[in-house]
């Protein structure tokens, strides 16, 4: 029993580190997706280049549903719908990049 108790914190730490590395990898891959689909309007560092596009650094970090709807359906007159152009995996990678702060 004492060995199990000692092993649990080590296991938890290992899982946390593995999860953090996976998120970092996703953010890196998300940057590639961002550069392919988003950088023209939203700018290199998620800040527009003087246009009317939304500053993505200010996007709520806890609202994936809103992010997904905005990307897939478009937003207003400036943001085109990307449904059918970005995959579900690309969308998740973009979200990881957004979460990382660029």
Residue ranges and their predicted role:
Residues 40:
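Short, cysteine/histidine-rich loop/knuckle motifs that typically chelate Zn2+
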Residues 1-2, 28, 72, 80:
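Short alpha-helical segments used as structural interaction elements across diverse proteins
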Residues 1-11:
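Bacterial N-terminal signal peptides that target proteins for export
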Residues 27, 31, 35, 43-72:
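Gly/Gly-Pro-rich "capping" loops immediately C-terminal to redox-active cysteine motifs
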Residues 22-24:
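Boundary at the C-terminal end of the N-terminal hydrophobic targeting segment
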Residues 55-102:
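Extracytoplasmic electron-transfer domains, predominantly the class I c-type cytochrome c fold
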């Amino acid at each position: 029993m004492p060995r199990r108790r000692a092993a649990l914190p080590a296991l938890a730490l290992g899982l946390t580190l593995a999860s953090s590395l996976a998120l970092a990898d996703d953010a890196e891959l998300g940057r590639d997706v961002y550069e392919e689909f988003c950088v023209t309007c939203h700018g290199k560092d998620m800040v527009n280049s003087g246009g009317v596009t939304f500053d993505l650094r200010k996007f709520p970090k806890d609202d994936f549903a809103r992010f997904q709807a905005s990307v897939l359906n478009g937003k207003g007159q400036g943001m085109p719908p990307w449904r059918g152009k970005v995959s579900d995996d690309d969308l998740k990678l973009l979200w990881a990049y957004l979460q990382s702060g660029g």
